[in-house]
């Protein structure tokens, strides 16, 4: 079950401030979209087990995809798939490169590129709307 509100806390917690900061790297991308992805993929870092497809970490990247877009989000000199800061900033970079900042159909296409499931874009957008309203 997805949390209706975002967690708060320190470095290991994926809270609103992290999503807001990462979204600012992609003009037009709402922090709520990143938060919705984090909520769907790992319940904001609560479940980071490796998926059956091999996706890992709080934003559930396949290692090759993470390597392609990797960002050192916390400035420690490393971009790690299991680090919440690195993973969220990397998600923002990937989404932005796929046109998410343009909104509308481009955002939907970027979300589908993030997770190739028909149900995924509407689920992300629905949860993002809930976060925007909270």
Question: What positions do the PLM features span?
Answer:
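Catalytic glycan-binding domains that act on GlcNAc-containing polysaccharides
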Residues: 1-134
């Amino acid at each position: 079950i997805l949390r209706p509100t975002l967690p708060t806390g320190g470095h290991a917690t994926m809270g609103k401030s992290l999503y807001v900061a990462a979204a600012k790297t992609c003009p037009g991308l709402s922090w709520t979209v990143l938060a919705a992805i984090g909520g769907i993929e790992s319940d904001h870092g609560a479940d980071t087990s490796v998926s059956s497809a091999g996706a890992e970490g709080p934003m559930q990247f396949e290692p090759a995809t993470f390597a392609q877009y990797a960002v050192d989000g916390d400035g420690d000199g490393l971009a790690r798939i299991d680090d919440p800061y690195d993973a969220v900033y990397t998600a923002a970079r990937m989404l932005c490169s796929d046109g998410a900042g343009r909104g509308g159909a481009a955002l939907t296409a970027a979300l589908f590129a993030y997770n190739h499931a028909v149900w995924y874009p509407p689920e992300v957008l629905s949860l993002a709307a809930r976060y925007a309203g909270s």
